[in-house]
């Protein structure tokens, strides 16, 4: 509920989802917070209360899947107030091509400091864009960063309902625990994850400094005029 230029972050993220063109009735906020739930109700945002026992966002979506009747669930985290709606649409369209696949976003890492940053999950995948592994360590591990492409995770996911139900049956698995990356549970369960290239413009808001970065983007004259950042 932190405000960004006067608008609550969860509301901004919800607005990004609406800009994707997805039907409003199929977009909801899943939360274990009564404060967020009440805020959503006051602002006519469809929402659902989940258990405080959910250890990851994917566990939360899996709980929603048990309570609702959809075949595919797309998870955009609530701390993504300037997420590109074109990327949301891209993930939605890919679910039509791969309706039984788990889908996750990625983009190229263009700065060495981001490659070394342990807060950013790095991604390696096959020629067919199937996830091989993710790590908070720099992978592939090499000193020639400027000459070799590296990639990072973008935190938007698409899940078939059946995959979420299987995911929920297990507790955190070893690599998921050691890396603190929830998508690895699917890899450890020998389920494939299809990676899709997205833009690198989004900023996940984890600190007060991130709020300032987002406000700086929103205040730029050239983006005020566009629907992408309104």
Give each language-model segment a name.
Residues 28, 34-93:
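Short phosphate-binding loop-to-helix
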């Amino acid at each position: 509920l932190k405000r960004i230029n006067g608008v609550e972050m969860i509301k901004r993220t919800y607005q990004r989802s609406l800009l994707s063109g997805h039907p409003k009735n199929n977009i909801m906020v899943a939360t274990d917070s009564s404060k967020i739930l009440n805020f959503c109700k006051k602002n006519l945002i469809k929402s659902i209360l989940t258990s405080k026992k959910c250890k990851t966002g994917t566990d939360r979506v899996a709980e929603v899947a048990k309570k609702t009747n959809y075949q595919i669930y797309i998870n955009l985290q609530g701390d993504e107030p300037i997420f590109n709606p074109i990327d949301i649409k891209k993930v939605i369209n890919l679910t039509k091509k791969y309706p039984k696949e788990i889908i996750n976003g990625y983009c190229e890492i263009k700065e060495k400091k981001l490659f070394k940053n342990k807060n950013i999950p790095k991604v390696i995948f096959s020629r067919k864009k199937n996830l091989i592994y993710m790590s908070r360590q720099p992978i592939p591990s090499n000193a020639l960063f400027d000459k070799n492409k590296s990639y990072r995770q973008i935190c938007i996911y698409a899940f078939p309902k059946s995959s979420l139900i299987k995911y929920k049956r297990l507790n955190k698995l070893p690599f998921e625990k050691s890396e603190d990356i929830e998508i690895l549970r699917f890899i450890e369960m020998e389920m494939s994850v299809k990676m899709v290239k997205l833009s690198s413009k989004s900023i996940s808001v984890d600190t007060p400094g991130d709020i300032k970065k987002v406000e700086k983007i929103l205040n730029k004259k050239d983006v005020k005029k566009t629907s992408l950042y309104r």
